[in-house]
């Protein structure tokens, strides 16, 4: 923790530098960052699980306390308005007493609707950053989530501080423990629900604490890209297991995927081929490389796998140009990672907000940035048997390039995805996931 504490000082200094630059450019007095507030379920007296504003947790690891506010201008010590009501119904947040408290001045707020008493008296030149624009309007903010400020913050968020990198190494460490437990549960005959429980226990995080809904998919369910239903019965026969699951540390996410075969067979060989291809793509990551080019190179490798495993005929370029590889690998290679699983700024060319869209042929790619040092990205190639997409191939001449017998053979296994979390350094890549021993 001592090292994290030391890194935090430099982290806050960098965030202050960024804020000072953008508020001066936009003639603002500063930013007022709202942690957020609960959302009430329709016709109910209960709230949905609270999710903190990522711009708020960039400054402070306060993840579960709504109605907090942070005032920053890049010059003065940040001011934290910390919500601590008198409430006998719910657990009230403890008074902050952690390493980060030395870097903020703290004022306590006991009633959420009295925050105006603690905000700057002349709020006109301060910009509100948060979700609740109606609250901001009532409080008198004229500037709310201004595009220039948001683009600047999102663009620079891609460059992680040493504190952020340390947090993400820790979130990977926690997630790897869960993945090992889930793998063992799979081979011991667990159902999707049981595997999920083993994962959560190993990470010591609940379903509302992990950064996204875990994907725990057995057999054909692995062909559903965002499968989040958990079946209580263990399938028979047991063929395959795809797990896409992460963990959270101080608000920073990990996002890891593995695929396993229950027995040695053609599917296990395909997993090994995908694993080699994924590591080869990671080896080519370096500053100056365009993420789009990594994605296109992955399609070359997927095309070769389709040929090698007798799933399709033809040459690699033809399979790519005709969109056949996109049927088997329909999603993007990965995305930026950080405060959010799909971290902001993946399409920004510069701090002014210039947008670079994904190529027309690959609309689901979530990142078009050029790699730079201290960026963190996922690399997650996949190959799936998705009937709704394969049906499109049967409607034209491309059907003759697909070996449907091979497709039928692999259909019960669902699909494959392998995902690691990688830090780009100036002179190397750091595969946080593999460095922790997760094969």
From Swiss-Prot:
Mn(2+) 1 binds at residues 255, 335, 380, 419. GO terms for cellular component: cytosol. It comes from Shewanella sediminis (strain HAW-EB3). Splits dipeptides with a prolyl residue in the C-terminal position. The keyword Hydrolase applies. Signal peptide: none annotated. The keyword Hydrolase applies. GO terms for molecular function: aminopeptidase activity; metal ion binding; metalloexopeptidase activity; phosphoric triester hydrolase activity; proline dipeptidase activity. GO terms for biological process: proteolysis. Mn(2+) 2 binds at residues 244, 255, 419. Its cofactor is Mn(2+). It catalyses: Xaa-L-Pro dipeptide + H2O = an L-alpha-amino acid + L-proline. The gene is pepQ. Belongs to the peptidase M24B family. Bacterial-type prolidase subfamily. CDD domains: Prolidase. Pfam families: PepQ_N, Peptidase_M24. Binds 2 manganese ions per subunit. Its EC number is 3.4.13.9. This is Xaa-Pro dipeptidase. Keywords: Dipeptidase, Hydrolase, Manganese, Metal-binding, Metalloprotease, Protease. InterPro entries: Creatin/AminoP/Spt16_N, Creatinase/aminopeptidase-like, PepQ_N, Pept_M24, Peptidase_M24B_aminopep-P_CS, X-Pro_dipept-like, X_Pro_dipept.
């Amino acid at each position: 923790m001592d090292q994290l504490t030391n890194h935090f000082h430099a982290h806050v200094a960098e965030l202050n530098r960024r804020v000072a630059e953008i508020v001066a450019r936009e003639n603002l007095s500063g930013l007022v960052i709202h942690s957020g507030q609960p959302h009430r379920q329709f016709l109910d007296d209960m709230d949905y699980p609270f999710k903190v504003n990522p711009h708020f947790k960039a400054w402070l690891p306060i993840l579960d306390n709504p109605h907090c506010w942070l005032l920053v201008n890049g010059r003065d010590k940040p001011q934290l308005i910390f919500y601590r009501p008198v409430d006998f119904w719910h657990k009230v947040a403890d008074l902050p007493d952690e390493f980060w408290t030395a870097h903020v001045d703290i004022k306590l707020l006991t009633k959420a609707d009295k925050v105006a008493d603690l905000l700057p008296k002349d709020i006109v030149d301060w910009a509100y950053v948060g979700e609740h624009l109606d609250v901001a309007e009532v409080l008198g903010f004229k500037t709310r989530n201004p595009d220039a400020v948001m683009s600047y913050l999102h663009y620079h968020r891609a460059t992680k501080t040493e504190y952020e990198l340390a947090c993400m190494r820790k979130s990977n460490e926690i997630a790897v423990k869960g993945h090992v437990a889930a793998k063992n549960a799979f081979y011991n005959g667990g159902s999707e629900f049981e595997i999920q429980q083993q994962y959560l226990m190993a990470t010591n995080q609940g379903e509302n604490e992990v950064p996204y809904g875990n994907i725990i998919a057995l057999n054909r369910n692995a062909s559903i890209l965002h499968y989040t239903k958990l079946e209580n019965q263990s399938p028979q026969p047991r063929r395959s297991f795809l797990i896409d699951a992460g963990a959270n540390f101080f608000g920073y996410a990990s996002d890891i995927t593995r695929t396993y075969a229950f027995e040695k067979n053609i599917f296990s060989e395909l997993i090994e081929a995908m694993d080699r291809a994924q590591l080869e793509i990671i080896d080519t990551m370096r500053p100056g490389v365009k993420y789009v080019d990594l994605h296109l190179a992955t399609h070359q490798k997927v095309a070769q796998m389709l040929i090698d495993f007798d799933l399709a005929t033809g040459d690699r370029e033809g399979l790519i140009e005709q969109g056949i590889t996109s049927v088997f690998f329909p999603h993007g290679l990965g995305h930026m990672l950080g405060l959010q699983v799909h971290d902001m700024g993946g399409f920004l060319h510069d701090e002014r907000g210039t947008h670079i869209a994904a190529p027309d042929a690959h609309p689901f790619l979530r990142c078009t940035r050029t790699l730079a040092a201290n960026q963190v990205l996922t690399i997650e190639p996949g190959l799936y048997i998705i009937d709704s997409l394969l049906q499109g191939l049967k409607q034209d001449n491309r059907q003759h390039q697909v070996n449907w017998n091979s497709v039928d053979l692999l259909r019960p296994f669902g699909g494959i995805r392998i995902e690691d979390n990688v830090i780009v350094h100036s002179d190397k890549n750091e595969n946080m996931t593999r460095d922790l021993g997760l094969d």
